[in-house]
Amino acid sequence: MANFDLTRINCQFLDRHLTFPLLEFLCGKEIYNQQELLEYILETVNKTNMIDYTMDTRKRLNLSQEMPDELVQRKAEVLATLKQLQNEVAPIMKATDILKNGESMKDSKTFVNALQKDYNFKVEHLESAYKLAKYLYECGNYQESTSYLYFCLIVMSPNDKNYLNVLWGKLAAEILTLNWNTALEDLTRLRDYIDSANFSTIQALQQRTWLIHWSVLVFFNHPKGRDLIIEMFLYKPLYLNAIQTMCPHIMRYLATAVVINRTRRNALKDLIKVIQQESYTYRDPITEFLECLYVNFDFEGARLKLHECQTVILNDFFIVACLNEFVEDARLMIFETFCRIHQCITISMLADKLNMKPNEAECWIVNLIRNARLNAKIDSKLGHVVMGTQPLSPYQQLVEKIDSLSMRSEHLAGLIERKSKQNNKESIDSWKYY
């Protein structure tokens, strides 16, 4: 299934360190040549200061078991540089106590004043803290790096030349240490900064494209992520536009989120529209499954695509944990769509559509009825399932209306903002001539 593997594309939009989990995941699969994959990992890790990881990869490639002189020298240089940077930051090391109580500070200005008063804090110390945080990150010491990055975020002005780098670094470090709650906070902070910054159109598009890829790692690991990925990718026009323009392959992850999120079935209609619009630039078994089911009502095609979906998800680092849930919810979607067309269905027919044995299909339907998720009755003698009415709840109707209005409002707000910026620019340009 290498033709459906997105690792190569996704890695283009990820920090070097964020690619390592994806590449190591592929090592456990039989998609690519193991030797070539390890050689690529070695080539990538050589660009970092992770000497131990480099040696480990060399051993896996059956290279020399002893550390080459070049690596010995590099390790010594890394340790020396690290010690030098730590010495530069030493004057503010005692500020860790006040940093722990940072939440009690009203704002960053209060915090900086306290640092200047109690610890003789200077601007040079901030630059040193930033360099040390970056160096620790390059060495793979992500946990310690987050402490200094957090310090920089509190002390730095948003206008600082390194502020955006700190935001990206903090998000990457939190992802790599699996701190999903903090990562989500950093993701939101970074998104707000990008959306409000005075970037050019191209710069903003590039920043959002990178953020989209990084956010997938957070959304599929955070309890609230399944709702948030739909809100950001489908109902925020700026990000939907970035997906359609720069990375239509992200449709795989948006589609997966909608399938496994039963409370957001109202998003299906909007998702299908986008899938149809982008079908000429990107298609995979997951998007084709939804097309078969909701556009063509091709149940046989949907059944076959669902089988392919399982292989795709099994080999995708971002969504592999969703495999069982995806299959279960996809079967439910096939079942619900089939039931809208047929009021009386044979269990054998359903089993065929769901890729299940008849007795498994019957048990599956019984569990749906038992859990109050299906208004139906089973006639065991005839082997029939008789469907009741499935009314759309007022709550679902309200949510659908709100989502639609929210998307339109945000789109209009974006148009007004762009028009305002254009008018202001014309006004400034006109002023230059007088």
From Swiss-Prot:
Ranges where the PCI domain occurs: 219-392
Per UniProt, subcellular location reads as: Cytoplasm
Q: Which residues cross the membrane?
A: none
Question: What Pfam families does the entry give?
Answer: eIF3_N, PCI
- InterPro entries (alphabetical): eIF3e (IPR016650), eIF3e_N (IPR019010), PCI_dom (IPR000717), WH_DNA-bd_sf (IPR036390)
Principal cellular location given in the protein's record: cytoplasm
Q: Which UniProt keywords apply?
A: Cytoplasm, Initiation factor, Protein biosynthesis
Give the signal peptide range.
none
The domain of life for this entry's organism is Eukaryota
Q: Care to name a GO molecular-function term for this sequence?
A: translation initiation factor activity
Q: Which GO terms describe its cellular component?
A: eukaryotic 43S preinitiation complex; eukaryotic 48S preinitiation complex; eukaryotic translation initiation factor 3 complex, eIF3e; intracellular membrane-bounded organelle
Might you name a Gene Ontology BP term for this protein? formation of cytoplasmic translation initiation complex
Q: Please describe what this protein does.
A: Component of the eukaryotic translation initiation factor 3 (eIF-3) complex, which is involved in protein synthesis of a specialized repertoire of mRNAs and, together with other initiation factors, stimulates binding of mRNA and methionyl-tRNAi to the 40S ribosome. The eIF-3 complex specifically targets and initiates translation of a subset of mRNAs involved in cell proliferation.
Q: How does it assemble?
A: Component of the eukaryotic translation initiation factor 3 (eIF-3) complex. The eIF-3 complex interacts with pix. Interacts with mxt.
User: Which family does the record assign?
Assistant: Belongs to the eIF-3 subunit E family.
HAMAP family (alphabetical): eIF3e
Task: State what protein this is by name.
Answer: Eukaryotic translation initiation factor 3 subunit E
Q: Which gene encodes it?
A: eIF3-S6
